[in-house]
A protein has these predicted regions:
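Short amphipathic alpha-helical segments and helix-helix/interface helices
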Residues: 17, 79, 134-138
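Short gly/ser/thr-rich secondary-structure transition/capping motifs
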Residues: 22-30, 94, 154-155
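Short, flexible active-site-adjacent loop segments at beta-strand->alpha-helix junctions, enriched
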Residues: 33, 47-48, 55, 60, ...
Length: 218
């Protein structure tokens, strides 16, 4: 991967973030070779903390775009900061056609898009169900779909906490999901649901592998 096409401010933040992540969180990345170095890629990640986009951005060397709930885009200086981080707003609770259209555009332009298939942060770390919009986007674009599991961010910055604390954080990238069977199927809610199930199964497998490694290191 290369950083030639990164926005200057975004590139600078990544340069700053990486050593800080390693120092403060004992940051480790596994399976980064599973992320294609070019072309549109959907990174499907469990959502545990507001730190998640930061640790993903610090582990890849490409421009990373991601959705963030629309309520975060105020006041204006927060909005400008989020936009500088390649974030774009999405309304939760109902299908947001504008956000979906933007996501498809980003992928068709050959970019890396971070998606939280569950739609919101987990309260207790358990994995939930993928939103149908995830399957729709994956079905409509000829892009790689990579499951990702992040571990430790919930301990570092749990939901409801105002403060960040030191914790071991790891990111595990799985192999791209074989999408051929789904993309050859008709566009339907059933197909989108099956894609979502495959995505969450991929994340669950990575979570299980991580838990086994943690038990083995004790």
């Amino acid at each position: 991967m290369n950083s030639r096409n990164m926005k200057p401010f975004y590139h600078l933040l990544c340069i700053i973030a990486r050593p800080l992540l390693k120092a403060f969180f004992k940051f480790q990345v596994f399976g980064i070779e599973n992320v294609p170095s070019a072309g549109g890629v959907m990174l499907m990640i469990n959502h545990a903390s507001y730190l998640d986009p930061i640790v993903i951005g610090g582990s890849v060397n490409r421009n990373l775009y991601y959705m963030a709930k629309s309520t975060l885009f105020s006041p204006w200086f927060i909005k400008r900061f989020l936009i500088s981080l390649n974030a774009f707003p999405v309304r939760l609770g109902s299908p947001d056609r504008g956000a979906i259209k933007r996501a498809i555009q980003i992928l068709n332009e050959g970019n890396l898009l971070l998606i939280f298939p569950e739609g919101t942060r987990s309260i207790d770390g358990t994995l939930g169900k993928a939103q149908d919009g995830v399957g729709f986007i994956a079905h409509r674009t000829n892009t790689a779909v990579v499951p990702v599991f992040v571990d430790g961010t919930r301990a570092a910055w749990p939901r409801g906490s105002k403060f960040i604390k030191s914790a071991k954080v790891t990111v595990s990238y799985g192999k791209p999901i074989d999408m051929s069977i789904y993309r050859s199927s008709e566009a339907s809610r059933e197909t989108y649901s099956k894609i979502g199930e495959a995505v969450m199964a991929g994340i669950a497998d990575l979570k299980h592998e991580r838990e086994l490694l943690k038990k083995g290191s004790r």
